[in-house]
Amino acid sequence: MKVYKSFLIATASLFLFACSSFQNDDYAMNYKGQIGEPIMAIAMLSEQQHEWAGTPYVLGGVSRRGVDCSGFVQKTFFDRFNLRLPRSTVEQANYGKHVRKEDIQTGDLIFFKTGRGPNGYHVGIYVKEDKFLHASTRGGVVYSSMNNPYWSKAFWQVRRI
């Protein structure tokens, strides 16, 4: 009987350890969203805004100590969608495909002629319902409305990556 109990315990232990899970970092998944999936893209952009909220605007910056508009767009597209974009607003304004304002979709780049900065351009990422995410000179990383008179007047173009 003692041998039988030992056999049962050994067999049960084998099953328990054989079925237990382990985490191997080699197989860990780091999901990056797809810019073409609107719901996922909105969630990814929301996460990025949450992480970068409070980051001040700093011309030429690309870190949480300070970031400018094109740096934030470049960082967001790489961090969230694994896409590499050019660094400057001028280069980003020539990247991808031109899209009519009426056809704007989540993840499109929206450009403005503000007359500020080294080239007078500003860029953000369209989210939904006329809202876009950007690094603002006044509020840092924020959502703004395209319907705001300032942004509406300064609107220039939309590009799809």
UniProtKB/Swiss-Prot annotation:
One cellular-component annotation, GO: plasma membrane
GO molecular-function terms, A-Z: cysteine-type peptidase activity; endopeptidase activity
Lipid-modified residues, S-diacylglycerol cysteine kind: C19
Transmembrane segments: none
Gene3D superfamilies in the record: endopeptidase domain like (from Nostoc punctiforme) (3.90.1720.10)
Topology relative to the membrane: Lipid-anchor
One biological process term in Gene Ontology: proteolysis
Lipidation sites (N-palmitoyl cysteine): C19
Domain NlpC/P60, chain residue ranges per copy: 39-161
Entry EC no(s): 3.4.-.-
Main location class: membrane
Keywords: Cell membrane, Hydrolase, Lipoprotein, Membrane, Palmitate, Protease, Signal, Thiol protease
Origin: domain of life: Bacteria
Keyword Chloroplast attached: no
EC top class, as a word: hydrolase
Signal peptide from the UniProt entry: 1-18
Record PANTHER family: ENDOPEPTIDASE NLPC-RELATED (PTHR47360:SF1), MUREIN DD-ENDOPEPTIDASE MEPS/MUREIN LD-CARBOXYPEPTIDASE (PTHR47360)
Record-given protein name: Probable endopeptidase HI_1314
Species this chain originates from: Haemophilus influenzae (strain ATCC 51907 / DSM 11121 / KW20 / Rd)
